[in-house]
Amino acid sequence: MLIDYKKVNIYQDERLILKDVDFQAEQGEFIYLIGRVGSGKSSLLKTIYGELDIDSEDAEKAVVLGEKMPDIKRSRIPALRRQMGIIFQDFQLLHDRSVAKNLKFVLQATGWNDRKKISRRIGEVLEQVGMTDKKDKMPSELSGGEQQRVVIARALLNMPKMILADEPTGNLDPETAANIVSILKDTCQTGTTVIMSTHNISLLDRFPGRVYRCKDGGLSQLNDKQDACDLDEEAALIEPIIEPAQDE
């Protein structure tokens, strides 16, 4: 099991965001986190990659990739994160470097120094996300969907055990959003776990996965027999998605 949370209380700025969280993730799973803005989705993800602390008195159990999160030292956080790929809604690419040089920068920063291996790995991840022909382009020359593909490629560079994607399709049109989720879903076939927060409830039917919902200060798992109207109700509660048209 990659993540095992039992009765975890999650705080942000001393304010209780989620209470008694039970959350588990196994290898190769695709997991959705849904809920309204401010419901705790991002806060939960932040505890997983060590951005938010978990105090020992606020958790019966909180283990991520073998690390007991209430006890983890800050010096261990970089090593933990190197086992993860983290994707945000805002792409955070280096705009003064080409696609290939963005990826090369990450590899060199994480200890890669063999030029041939670096070049080979960049080619592998760009092929995985369908961006081989864009390796020499600057980020400003790419559409929003293309930039997000590069971000996914960047997240895959070090062959992570899990990918945490916080609203990765939030600024994309529906077709491009579906393409991005399809790429993320495919990564699960190699054993990578993907945990994705989203407002876009329509993706759940098209790309099935386990679903957790943040609501009213708690986290609950929706099971396969959950009444369909429950998700329809959730969609009505969640703020409308603004999806500007972008050329892919």
PLM features: what roles do these ranges have?
Residues 61-79:
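ABC ATPase NBD Q-loop/coupling interface
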Residues 138-142, 146-148:
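Conserved ABC ATPase signature
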Residues 137-140, 158, 190:
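Conserved signature/switch motifs of ABC ATPase nucleotide-binding domains
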Residues 163-166:
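Catalytic Walker B motif of ABC-type/P-loop ATPase nucleotide-binding domains
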Residues 97-105:
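Short coil-to-helix segment of the ABC ATPase nucleotide-binding domain corresponding to the Q-loop/switch region
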Residues 49:
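Helix-to-loop junction immediately C-terminal to a conserved catalytic motif
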Residues 174-176:
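Helix N-cap at the start of a conserved alpha-helix in ABC-type nucleotide-binding domains
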